[in-house]
Amino acid sequence: MRSDPEILVLGIGNLLWADEGFGVRAVEALQRHWVMSSNVQLLDGGTQGIYLVDRVRKADVLVVFDAVDYGLPPGTMKRVEDDEVPRFLGAKKMSLHQTGFQEVLALAAMLGDYPKHLLLIGVQPVELDDFGGSLRPQIKERITPAIEMALEYLAQFGVVARRREDSTVDSPHLPHPSLDLIAYESGRPGPEIACRIGDERVLTSLSARTVQPGNPHGDRQ
């Protein structure tokens, strides 16, 4: 008797850099609003990269949400399947996590445990260079259609999904309350307190080391 396939739905990206968080937010919304078949595992992969390889190796079916530079207009959502997925993840890398996930897929293939079915649901980001920022409205609007696309794809593998009556579900798979989308957006300090382009301590340090005319070694102490 054929057993149900092991299915992994994975969101990758970085919540701290605006639209980079699309994949993580998509899985968060899926966990919060839908109950899935018991053979489906939802995972916030964040920027873990190579550390995800064991999870990927166990999956027969892998669905990935991510912000991807397709070279398309901002906000465009695009699906890519099977052997095309690594090529699109690597075409225009926007962050180190994409390099890491390419390596995850390559290592899984090398070890002979590559998913039989692979779907990438990506969205072209609007803004990435906003440290501590949230999804832009144009990207946030893509979460629901991205989830619908994933559920339609998973239905062919016998996955049954039903809406939760209460979206305040308490789950270890959801982010820390401080990183919940609403809390994250409403609790963000103003630009006079929180630098928008990175850690101000690091930026100040780098600025102090900038080479000035007549001072080839910078302002090092």
Curated annotation (Swiss-Prot):
Ni(2+) binds at residues 20, 66, 97. Gene3D superfamilies: HybD-like. One of its GO terms (molecular function) is enzyme activator activity. InterPro entries: Pept_A31_hyd_express, Pept_HybD-like_dom_sf, Peptidase_A31. CDD domains: H2MP_MemB-H2up. GO terms for biological process: protein processing. Keywords: Aspartyl protease, Hydrolase, Metal-binding, Nickel, Protease. Not known. Could be involved in the processing of hydrogenase. Belongs to the peptidase A31 family. This is Hydrogenase expression/formation protein HupD. It comes from Thiocapsa roseopersicina. The gene is hupD.
